[in-house]
């Protein structure tokens, strides 16, 4: 355990918040894309589809790198049990809160919007369970994955810490080219695992909990570990914060490959396996692109930025049902996709900010949506 706090990483805080807030334009653009979603506009937009695909191709990979970075930083700061408790509470409590308050009402809304209420009694027990697993976890899936990664990383982080204590500090002698090869092989390994499952027991791939707990965790664990390694080895982090023309060009080529796979691939063939390889390496390259841009443009302290850093999780949690409400009841009345998209951003962001300010004034809600226990008045007085 370290008593010396690490210097504040303002650009990483900002990037993490922006990646979270990107969920709003991502889901609103999904309404106007060619992808089939819960709610869709009458006529899809090609450029909003392109915008949606771009966000989807890299956002969460970069997010999990930052999560791994901060997780290991806090691992060194707290005793093991306290670290696990704090990390799980910070993501687990908001997730468990959002299920009854947000995703359950969202599920009921969609049942009426899609006129599925009459079909519900005809579903088997497993079909009901699986439907609820997909719909109630919904956009909260990454919180569940973070709980799992936090638990799994106890052994990994302990091993990292022991190696730091017993061996002399040395540079992480690994280039971005070598990292790219490693992540390409990891993508191939993930694709092979998925293909074997598809051959042996394809039905399990449609199981919501299996998808979230096993498949999503397997895909994102390399990025989470990479974040921890970036904290351990400053020179590795420097590789990501230094602009790389190769990573930028590689990410552009990977995105084109991603689009071609979306356009010409088949789910019954190798589309999902190909996508996993592409997004694995594109995610790595976009870490360099996003970190280098963020380090240059966002590495400063600002009250406004801090506000959105603190608000980003709450806004992300509430934006999804607001987006679906907008898509179901307001989108049909707006003929222009561009105007609809902009109105959606204003509608969702405006209401989310109002709800955020309201919840700050209710201590119970503030705790439930942040996982942070209230600071006792005695502690505040002592600090002051």
Curated annotation (Swiss-Prot):
Name of the gene encoding the protein in the UniProt record: mdoC
HAMAP family: MdoC_OpgC
One GO process term, biological-process aspect: glucan biosynthetic process
Gene Ontology cellular-component terms listed: plasma membrane
Protein name as it appears in the record: Glucans biosynthesis protein C
NCBIfam families: PRK03854.1 (NF003014)
Topology relative to the membrane: Multi-pass membrane protein
Major localization class: membrane
EC primary class: transferase
EC number: 2.1.-.-
Family designation: Belongs to the acyltransferase 3 family. OpgC subfamily.
Entry keywords, A to Z: Acyltransferase, Cell membrane, Membrane, Transferase, Transmembrane, Transmembrane helix
Record-annotated membrane-spanning stretches: 17-37, 54-74, 91-111, 140-160, 173-193, 212-232, 240-260, 274-294, 311-331, 338-358
Subcellular location: Cell membrane
Molecular functions (GO terms): acyltransferase activity, transferring groups other than amino-acyl groups; transferase activity, transferring one-carbon groups
Record pathway: Glycan metabolism; osmoregulated periplasmic glucan (OPG) biosynthesis
Summary of the function given for this chain in its UniProt record: Necessary for the succinyl substitution of periplasmic glucans. Could catalyze the transfer of succinyl residues from the cytoplasmic side of the membrane to the nascent glucan backbones on the periplasmic side of the membrane.
UniProt organism field: Salmonella paratyphi A (strain AKU_12601)
